[in-house]
Amino acid sequence: LERETLKIIYFSKNYTPHDYRFLFSLSQTKHEIFFLQLEATLRQTEDRPVPANVRQILWAGGKREFRWRDVPRLTFDLRRLTKEIKPDLIHAGPIQNCAFIVALGGFRHLLAMSWGYDLVMEADKNWWMKRVTRYTLRKSAFFTSDANVTREKAIAYGMNPEHTVVFPWGIDLEHFRPKDTESRKRKAASSKKKLSVSSKQSKEVTLFCSRTWESIYGVDVLAKAFVKVASVNPDVNLILLGGGSQSARIRQILMNGGVMERVHFGGQVGQGDLPRWYHMADIYISPSHVDGSSVTLMEAMASGLPCLVSDIAGNKEWIEDGVNGWLFRDGDVDDLAEKILSAIKSKREFRRIGELARKTAEERADWRKNFGTLLEAYEKVKSD
């Protein structure tokens, strides 16, 4: 059966690489797509423009950070928009702001999408957030998330389990792929020529983290662990990408530890250039305290990198300790440092573990396959 053309409003808090991925894929369908942004873009994380064939809507939101006192005004304006556009469904998330505003506005065909942190962390913050979460999910026609941990949380807050679908947001497996064997051969040949430094090169290990420098992502935990590792092993380096509100704190930890010269700050890196950074590394580290299915973890796995990640539920859906990566106790600096040093000792295993990580990504993280699940969910929302 041929799917009918739908009018869809995609309503998100900001405009990130994740939003671009959804909007670009939606723009390639026959559906009519509208993009609604809740907040002004304060820290640019996506340098590509909103895809062609997507109509960005000017409305009461999108001008500043979200404030609770603006909710009535935003809700009234969203009602106006739904009367004008007459969408078949609204795809909205995070739960406690975008999806909540749609639920308050009384729009029935709401697909609420969790962004991970909204249910794992925000939902239980206080009585108000609990009420907002419960209200939104009970008013949602359908719910989607990228991990079982968030689906279970949504059900606990009143979402009908039969109206839920889990699919990892996934990545482009052609864009993120292991270094080819030819480049490995070239690297090996060039290192043999540099005999004076060849022994040092063979010992060097580069750690890599691309998480945003916000408290929920635990980059400060990695910084502290790196100071400990560097005091034991002089051949370990660290690459940090991105930035965020913890920038001063993280730099201070590294400066006080006397390891600044062994850390490379790559800044904000566009999607086109990201694979090159993964290829510079030997181990990918994600010290996040909160995650569903982490897209950066999927990128690293697809790039054939062995990954060392916090033992939170979302990560354990992807990493089997000692098989296709390693786990450390969430927030435990000493355990992370020990696991890094232990991994380095088994450097000869990196290739094998990286190959298993790539295999996992190929089986479960293919965006093109996973996106079809979203389109099926749209049909269910429309027919609800």
Locations of the language-model features?
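Short alpha-helical donor nucleotide-sugar binding micro-motif in glycosyltransferases
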Residues: 82, 137, 268-269, 276-281
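Short hydrophobic beta-strand element within catalytic cores of glycosyltransferases
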Residues: 306-309
